């Protein structure tokens, strides 16, 4: 096979009509690297046309060599087809992505990504840990404090209270803290959404929301070079900083993990910022260990 040399990528544009070809590219990269280079919600945004893409077309628009994806103000996400690498394509795409978005994700922080970041004078500014543990979880004995009960989320009733507490709990978080009613509605419309796995700690009496644990089930992916079974996730675990009650996170975490085990899942995962020491300690107490590091890189001269 003769590999065409890297050229200049086309202009940034929305590409819902090219989503299938880009999905094939992303899947091939994930199979080769053992880690998905583009996150699920960004792939959804490519399909819907909400994201902007910069495509290295390679020899044919139907068989792209690489892509950079920009969504809102978030760090860009970039990948190159496994058989088109070491030709300067990644360098061109990452340079353009950082110029547009100011930063780029490196999922898995693989050695090739580290080397490219160093060559482009990019430095790590954020580390998002993926942690995992086996299920079921042994009973830990966490009980709701006096005056608190646990119930599940009720669509049509709890959205506004959840958004208020979520905004306070994640006020400094670059993604979760800006979730609004529209974004929540989009999440609730997804096939994976299940209110039976969305747990709320509320006052009793009063039913005032204090904390929440939203779980998620990822379906099995048996095909490809890196097949996986279904996975359960601590999707979002948040406590209202104004609640003033200790132990709510532990109670809700255990309840959610028990639910995921009852669904027949044998592995739970979560994502947590590496510098969120209290959360990391909680998850370590629950038996989670680091499975993967995801890093945001920015130019060395950028704050």
From Swiss-Prot:
Enzyme class label: transferase
S-adenosyl-L-methionine among keywords: no
Protein residues bound to acetyl-CoA 2: 237-239, 244-250, 276-281
Record-linked Gene3D superfamilies: 3.40.630.30
GO biological process: mycothiol biosynthetic process
Keywords: Acyltransferase, Repeat, Transferase
Pfam families cross-referenced by the UniProt entry: Acetyltransf_1
Similarity comment text for this entry: Belongs to the acetyltransferase family. MshD subfamily.
Record-given protein name: Mycothiol acetyltransferase
Organism: Nakamurella multipartita (strain ATCC 700099 / DSM 44233 / CIP 104796 / JCM 9543 / NBRC 105858 / Y-104) (Microsphaera multipartita)
């Amino acid at each position: 096979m003769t590999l065409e040399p890297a050229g200049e990528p086309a202009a940034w544009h929305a590409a819902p009509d090219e989503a299938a070809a880009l999905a094939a590219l992303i899947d091939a990269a994930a199979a080769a690297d053992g880690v998905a280079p583009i996150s699920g919600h960004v792939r959804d945004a490519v399909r819907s046309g909400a994201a902007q893409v910069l495509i290295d077309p390679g020899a044919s628009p139907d068989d792209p060599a690489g892509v950079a994806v920009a969504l809102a103000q978030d760090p860009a996400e970039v990948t190159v087809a496994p058989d088109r690498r070491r030709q300067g394509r990644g360098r061109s795409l990452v340079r353009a992505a950082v110029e547009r978005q100011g930063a780029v994700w490196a999922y898995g922080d693989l050695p090739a990504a580290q080397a490219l970041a160093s060559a482009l004078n990019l430095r790590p500014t954020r580390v998002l840990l993926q942690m995992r543990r086996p299920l079921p979880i042994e009973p830990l004995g966490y009980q709701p404090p006096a005056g608190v009960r646990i119930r599940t989320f009720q669509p049509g009733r709890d959205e506004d209270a959840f958004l208020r507490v979520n905004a306070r709990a994640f006020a400094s978080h670059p993604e979760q803290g800006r979730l609004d009613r529209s974004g929540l509605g989009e999440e609730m419309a997804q096939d994976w959404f299940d209110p039976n796995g969305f747990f709320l700690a509320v006052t009793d009496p009063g039913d005032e929301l204090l904390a929440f644990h939203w779980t998620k089930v990822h379906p099995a992916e048996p095909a490809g070079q890196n097949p996986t079974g279904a996975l359960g996730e601590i999707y979002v675990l948040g406590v209202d900083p104004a609640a003033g009650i200790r132990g709510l996170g532990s109670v809700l975490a255990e309840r959610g993990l028990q639910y995921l085990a009852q669904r027949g899942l044998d592995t739970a995962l979560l994502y947590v910022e590496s510098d969120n020491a209290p959360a990391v300690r909680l998850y370590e107490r629950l038996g989670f260990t680091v499975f993967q590091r995801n890093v945001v890189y920015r130019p060395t001269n950028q704050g």
